[in-house]
Amino acid sequence: MSDSEDSNFSEEEDSERSSDGEEAEVEEERRSAAGSEKEEEPEEEEEEEEEEEYDEEEEEEDDDRPPKKPRHGGFILDEADVDDEYEDEDQWEDGAEDILEKAPNIDNVVLDEDRSGARRLQNLWRDQREEELGEYYMKKYAKSSVGETVYGGSDELSDDITQQQLLPGVKDPNLWTVKCKIGEERATAISLMRKFIAYQFTDTPLQIKSVVAPEHVKGYIYVEAYKQTHVKQAIEGVGNLRLGYWNQQMVPIKEMTDVLKVVKEVANLKPKSWVRLKRGIYKDDIAQVDYVEPSQNTISLKMIPRIDYDRIKARMSLKDWFAKRKKFKRPPQRLFDAEKIRSLGGDVASDGDFLIFEGNRYSRKGFLFKSFAMSAVITEGVKPTLSELEKFEDQPEGIDLEVVTESTGREREHNFQPGDNVEVCEGELINLQGKILSVDGNKITIMPKHEDLKDMLEFPAQELRKYFKMGDHVKVIAGRFEGDTGLIVRVEENFVILFSDLTMHELKVLPRDLQLCSETASGVDVGGQHEWGELVQLDPQTVGVIVRLERETFQVLNMYGKVVTVRHQAVTRKKDNRFAVALDSEQNNIHVKDIVKVIDGPHSGREGEIRHLFRSFAFLHCKKLVENGGMFVCKTRHLVLAGGSKPRDVTNFTVGGFAPMSPRISSPMHPSAGGQRGGFGSPGGGSGGMSRGRGRRDNELIGQTVRISQGPYKGYIGVVKDATESTARVELHSTCQTISVDRQRLTTVGSRRPGGMTSTYGRTPMYGSQTPMYGSGSRTPMYGSQTPLQDGSRTPHYGSQTPLHDGSRTPAQSGAWDPNNPNTPSRAEEEYEYAFDDEPTPSPQAYGGTPNPQTPGYPDPSSPQVNPQYNPQTPGTPAMYNTDQFSPYAAPSPQGSYQPSPSPQSYHQVAPSPAGYQNTHSPASYHPTPSPMAYQASPSPSPVGYSPMTPGAPSPGGYNPHTPGSGIEQNSSDWVTTDIQVKVRDTYLDTQVVGQTGVIRSVTGGMCSVYLKDSEKVVSISSEHLEPITPTKNNKVKVILGEDREATGVLLSIDGEDGIVRMDPDEQLKILNLRFLGKLLEA
């Protein structure tokens, strides 16, 4: 073929191609102007064929075009290579390339294309309706995707392929890390943005593209720019970025996408796992996952409904308006009750296994099934308590209590420890048992217990649960019983029953809250202040023993046998009763740690060890009793000593091994006279040569109020807290400081003799030829036989007066000088404060006022084990009154016999005037000069000053003698208690205070802090100078003696010497002697 023919052929092809292009364009415009509603498939195929023909012709003409034309075409094609093909189809109309080739320059082509496009758009808007325009654009632009054309029409592409076009390339800006001040990353990014805006329209705008400050990156920000110099220009002058001004690190292209990668934590919720609601009426309620819809981001929950039955009732009773105006009240959790809803007029429909009410679905068991958004629930770290689970479902149906939502990137929430036995609860190895070797966060490494598996296996924490078998000894590490230990007695599917070591209760605990252990619980609470079995005070009148320790509460067995639950703060103080002593049913001394038998009451037949004594109650521990950890309480009169008691410090034995049976003798609150008078530092003083072991504790001195007589603390007063043979620990009143003092330097308050004074036993002869002078060992019986000793143990309880009326006594006339009546002792020495050798001249007569040699003349209270306060004077008339007809030295007148008044001041009464033998006392005599008044006997004993007497003395004055023990002894301080009204006796030294009434605020040893109403001040007075005020009708009273001591009540009426009292706790009526009652201060 010749060149001319070739050129002609090419020209024909060009013309043919151009004509074809023009026809296509005309056809397109014609269809647009006519407003055709759809394009048929043959037309689409023709367009594709035309495109293919155009591509082939383009390739064939590459060699035949003039040099300039290919240059224009090459430029366009190069740009097309970079861009995607589907963008060409979207941006260029068909035949646009032909127009460009024919155009003389590219500017005209762009202008013509804009004009034609605008013209066509105007035609469309003018001629077409909105629906037709929408359909046109849908068909125009919703063509098949590039993937269908390039990759053979696949429906969808993989994510990797579709995201490739969005990845950064070499021609994109780079990310540069710049060191920033920690904590100021976000503020620095904002300041760079403001700087960019400020420089945007200046001659030197910033060349950076963006700034990124991710939340998880500390100390760095990312700056996007093409060059490092652009970054330096931008950060120059920014204070927070001066650390990174000289060094910026470029992020590799492959790692740039990780900077902005957002990983959203999606909770791994599984059916039957637990969640809590965040808001609304169900806020903080526990719920169980029924199923999850990840696509809709919803979750269906099973929960206990909260239905407002009052609102339903109000609505059904045409009170809609009122119900709406009512203040919103959150209804309680309650299972759905269809019958109750119907009874209120509600409409309940049935839908298969569910009941429908107000659009909500309820199961037949009453649970609500409702869908919530994922954002409305708390899915992480939800651990239902055992009480919630029991309330949620009585009999769990395959519920896995150990399913806990997965926690990623957070603090581990399991409590697995190396050595725990575990079991796989999900996965392919379910039910495989093993032992934990190591714990690394949520990854647990175990050694399986299987013959075919010899290697260690690693599991996530949520796939394991603890496994226990019967007989394991475990410790509770969480929950209500935290800290308790016990033996597993039963293992159920979802919880474990263990038998507590300490309280001997059965505890129901979740397996996750247990841990294997070998030790036993200490029985001390979380704060370390209280322990199991400790005696605590619940209120001023009630004590109890802690029988169960829980995290926030105690269970206390009170003195009435009831178990009460109290919070830790309600226990005010501990009671220390290590030295308490009581009497059993056979009048035996019983102490703490003694073994006793119960012979009466609800616990009759039991045997136990005394743990605590309080008043007339004893708290016992029996190992055979399961209830309350073996602790029970009963009254001391229902006990009998079973024999041997556990070893204790026995330091109170008297001469010849005699052990006093009175609990008052060894009680530190009521020290015996031996401790007061016998000399603190004299080993063997008053004990006939028998001394305690060196360094052993002296219980007699503990609790006494003493004054320091020598040394740097001379004159200080304090209470003895501990004492040995040589030293004593004294707590000073003024400084609240406890110091150690030599016992030789101590003097008890109320005594004028130094404590270290030796005994004067055995001086022969002394005054009145008494052998020995103080008669410490020659009396038989040595101590006056008081039976019974304690108030409350007598039968009958009140009165105990034999005979009750005059004339029934046998013998009717018997004086104090009757040799058959042992007038021993005649008088308690400590009624007066005097020294042994104060009398300047010896009197030829005994202290009783007659020359009759008394043996002994008066009891020597220097024996450390004898408390003369409690020695009854037998017979009723002491020798001091000089009235007996048996005196060999005097012939009394017919009226010489009288009975002393049992008032508190009786021992200070003067001797009677010429009614009988009148004795002339020496100047140093212990008795005041008698006045000429006649003595008037008083048949009614006083609350404190009455000395028990036995019949036998003549009583012309008509005095009724009483059985020993029926009254309150002269110097007894047992009646002293707080909050009662008292009167200061005339024996007190301060005359301004004598006769005033007050209220006892506190009692320390024998000293009482009394608030005096008249002078409005608080003074410390010994109990021997106080007497209680007798209450009257309707007064608030407090029992000061007897088995009901410390109990309070109201005095309803008075019948002779008795009063009818309505007790406070149970409003029980009791008849009590008025001597046993003290008047309480009324508000």
UniProtKB/Swiss-Prot annotation:
Residues 1-92, 666-696, 743-974 are annotated as: Disordered. GO terms for biological process: regulation of DNA-templated transcription elongation; regulation of transcription by RNA polymerase II; transcription elongation-coupled chromatin remodeling. Residues 309-416 are annotated as: Interaction with RNA polymerase II. GO terms for cellular component: DSIF complex. The modification Phosphoserine is found at residues 32, 36, 662, 682, 785, 800. Residues 757-803, 863-886 have a biased composition (Polar residues). GO terms for molecular function: mRNA binding. Residues 840-946 are annotated as: 10 X 8 AA approximate tandem repeats of P-[TS]-P-S-P-[QA]-[SG]-Y, motif CTR2. The keyword Transcription regulation applies. RNA binds at residue 575. CTR repeats lie at residues 750-755, 756-761, 762-767, 768-774, 777-783, 784-790, 792-798, 799-805, 807-813, 840-847, 850-858, 859-865, 877-881, 892-898, 900-907, 912-917, 920-926, 928-935, 939-946. Methylated by PRMT1/HRMT1L2 and PRMT5/SKB1. Methylation negatively regulates interaction with P-TEFb and RNA polymerase II. Phosphorylated by CDK7 and CDK9. Phosphorylation by P-TEFb (CDK9) at Thr residues of the C-terminal repeats alleviates transcriptional pausing and promotes transcription elongation. Dephosphorylated by the INTAC complex when transcripts are unfavorably configured for transcriptional elongation, leading to premature transcription termination: dephosphorylation is mediated by the PPP2CA component of the INTAC complex. Dephosphorylated by the PNUTS-PP1 complex in termination zones downstream of poly(A) sites, thereby promoting deceleration of RNA polymerase II transcription. The modification Omega-N-methylarginine is found at residues 677, 692, 694. There is a cross-link at residues 139, 1033 (Glycyl lysine isopeptide (Lys-Gly) (interchain with G-Cter in SUMO2)). Residues 1-27, 38-64, 78-92, 830-840 have a biased composition (Acidic residues). Residues 750-813 are annotated as: 9 X 7 AA approximate tandem repeats of G-S-[QR]-T-P-X-[YQ], motif CTR1. Component of the DRB sensitivity-inducing factor complex (DSIF complex), which regulates mRNA processing and transcription elongation by RNA polymerase II. DSIF positively regulates mRNA capping by stimulating the mRNA guanylyltransferase activity of RNGTT/CAP1A. DSIF also acts cooperatively with the negative elongation factor complex (NELF complex) to enhance transcriptional pausing at sites proximal to the promoter. Transcriptional pausing may facilitate the assembly of an elongation competent RNA polymerase II complex. Belongs to the SPT5 family. This is Transcription elongation factor SPT5. The gene is SUPT5H.
